[in-house]
């Protein structure tokens, strides 16, 4: 994904970010790693990995998929397609404060924890406001995690260009905010 994003961009150099539910990448030593969040530096006809987060450390894509299906009862894929976008739409109408700390505690890594889907599913079924607030908390935690990681590496590897790839960057609300987070994108 990093190569596709960079080499199809027409940039001579760029910081490249991939965020998804899981992909195969190579670490700096050439070992295959299942990853969910990577940052690369592209220059000329080469890209090199700068930062790789393995699937067991962070997985925002799986967080969205599991919450979409287990809390909101929507499709996470086949046969109806992934309806995480519907949850993202709910997020803009909610207040993240009530559930933010709970999602922040798990830091986008809910598949390896004792995340309480049943409690949140019950709350979501009680009112539209709760559905919107839960979605807003997911959205805010996603944005905060992505922003903090990208900004850290953007300072270390400055570039006027940013290439994005992966399912999580299809989060249009978050991607739109990236224009506020970074100058000259």
Where do the protein language model's features map onto the residues?
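Short acidic/glycine-rich loops and adjacent helix/strand connectors
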Residues: 1-185
């Amino acid at each position: 994904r990093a190569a596709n994003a960079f080499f199809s961009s027409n940039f001579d150099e760029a910081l490249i970010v991939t965020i998804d539910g899981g992909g195969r990448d190579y670490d700096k030593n050439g070992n295959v790693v299942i990853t969910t969040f990577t940052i690369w530096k592209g220059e000329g006809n080469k890209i090199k990995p700068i930062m790789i987060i393995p699937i067991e450390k962070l997985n925002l894509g799986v967080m969205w998929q599991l919450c979409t299906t287990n809390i909101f009862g929507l499709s996470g894929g086949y046969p109806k397609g992934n309806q995480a976008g519907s949850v993202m739409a709910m997020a803009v109408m909610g207040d993240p404060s009530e559930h933010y700390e709970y999602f922040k505690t798990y830091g986008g890594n809910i598949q390896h924890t004792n995340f309480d889907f049943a409690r949140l599913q019950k709350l979501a079924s009680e009112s539209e406001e709760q559905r919107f607030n839960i979605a807003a908390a997911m959205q805010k935690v996603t944005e905060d995690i992505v922003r903090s990681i990208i900004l850290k590496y953007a300072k270390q590897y400055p570039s006027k260009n940013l290439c994005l790839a992966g399912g999580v960057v299809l989060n249009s609300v978050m991607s739109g905010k990236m224009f506020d987070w970074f100058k000259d994108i």
